[in-house]
Amino acid sequence: MHLIINKKRKGDEMEERIWDNSTISCFQTCRRKYYYQYVRHLRPKVKGTALLFGSAVHDALDVYYKNADREQGAVLAIAKFKEVYSTPEGDFLRTVENGVKLLTHYFLKYKHEPFTVVGKPEEGFVFPIGSILYGGRLDLPVEWDGQLWIMEHKTTSRLTSSYFNQYELDKQPTGYIIALEEFAGRKCSGCIINVLEPWKEVKRVTAKTKQPGDHFLRKPLTRSEELKDRFRYNVQAIVRDIKWCEEHDEYQEAEKKEACFYYNRNCPFMQLCQYGENDRIIKRDYVVEKWIPFENAMRKEG
């Protein structure tokens, strides 16, 4: 069920298209990638292992936090993980067994959570920013010591002290914080990044070997009113640029390592940028899958 926030103001001309973080971030990364992914609606036939594993963990945590009985929730969550995920060939880290181990130790470490869940996990939202609609999903809204927070689940294969730096100015948490404030009608203190790191058993344990509980970390991030205002402005500016590109059918390639090679893997559309839009390659390696966030959402008129 989608959470539709009814905040339309009189006189506003609201467009029906819903913009989200995935669309906007993709355009900022590379306009050509945006063209392939959101104009031509191409998706690689083979999805990345990290993405599949992270998605399965998200599904499991969604089941876990929806259940008031945590012990029962843990059993159902692990069953859900096994249902939606299978071990990819050649990956010895993101296996079903390691995923079950990861979730089991997560439930042990956070057996007694210091917060209560507000509403439902993975609730969808849509709210206006100027004349556009912005949408997404909230992983886990929580009440902690009388304060409202949004918790965002992340998985990583390398959890270091610098891991959280990437989220200090990231738009995604900022959008979640604003969305929760719009929905709740009260201040959201910030976004808690909840990180889970899968691990393989080591053959020789040393003093530096992580204990199971060390594979989980949380960090609260806050956003000033200035940053939230800047988010609103930037989202509208980026959407304006996207519309210009769509109107003029012009999408430049970024052609820089940060866009073409990231997280130790090639951009899924690299070969199309190298060799052109070859129909044979497209038919072989991609599927057409249109991205329409909240297609069935009904927006209330104010």
Spans of features found by a protein language model:
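RecB-family 4Fe-4S metal-dependent nuclease core
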Residues: 1-302
